Amino acid sequence: MADTSSPSFLQLALARQTVLAGGVIAYPTEAVWGLGCDPWNREAVEYILELKQRPMEKGVILVAASVEQVRFLLDPLPDAVQSEALRHWPGPVTCLLPDVNQQVPEWVRGKHSSIAVRVSDHPVVRALCEATGMPLVSTSCNPAGRQPARAIWQVRRYFGDRIDRIVPGALGGNRKPSRIIDIVTGQQFR
């Protein structure tokens, strides 16, 4: 598989099946390869965290194909906060949104009262979220302390057959992972 290929209909269908069955996928994002799964499946999220050697307390990002997929998080927020988030999407900006009704499980949110959310404009990320019908967990594809994978061979080197499916595609044009902005305070973390 070459990084420049796009996933076929069959590859997307298999990725969908993997995610819905509780598996873990690797896929290209705007800047680096990501690991993803069903955010409502605790075992799948915990497995990703185990692979990465990442503590649950840190939380992970949710990526979505559209604002509608994360509307449940936006609706309880004031109009001004919603507008600020919408100003950044779709695109390579991750917004920290208050999870005021605690709708996102603690294994995704971590120790935080906010949830990191990105409505992506990357075609593979969007296709995966559309195929599964939900936002997905997204975290960089690397063990803690190592550089994120920027090629399929690095994904395989880091995790071998411990990932259920690798979805082919090209990285987006960004050199760095997405910016992270607290949408209420405006503070930028990355």
From Swiss-Prot:
The lineage of its organism: Bacteria, Pseudomonadati, Pseudomonadota, Gammaproteobacteria, Pseudomonadales. Pfam families: Sua5_yciO_yrdC. PROSITE patterns: YRDC. It catalyses: L-threonine + hydrogencarbonate + ATP = L-threonylcarbamoyladenylate + diphosphate + H2O. This is Threonylcarbamoyl-AMP synthase. InterPro entries: DHBP_synth_RibB-like_a/b_dom, Sua5-like_dom, TC-AMP_synthase, TC-AMP_synthase_SUA5. GO terms for molecular function: ATP binding; double-stranded RNA binding; L-threonylcarbamoyladenylate synthase; tRNA binding. SUPFAM superfamilies: YrdC/RibB. Its EC number is 2.7.7.87. Keywords: ATP-binding, Cytoplasm, Nucleotide-binding, Nucleotidyltransferase, Transferase, tRNA processing. It is found in: Cytoplasm. It is an enzyme of class 2 (transferase). One of its GO terms (biological process) is regulation of translational fidelity. Residues 9-190 form the YrdC-like domain. It comes from the Bacteria. It comes from Marinobacter nauticus (strain ATCC 700491 / DSM 11845 / VT8). GO terms for cellular component: cytoplasm.
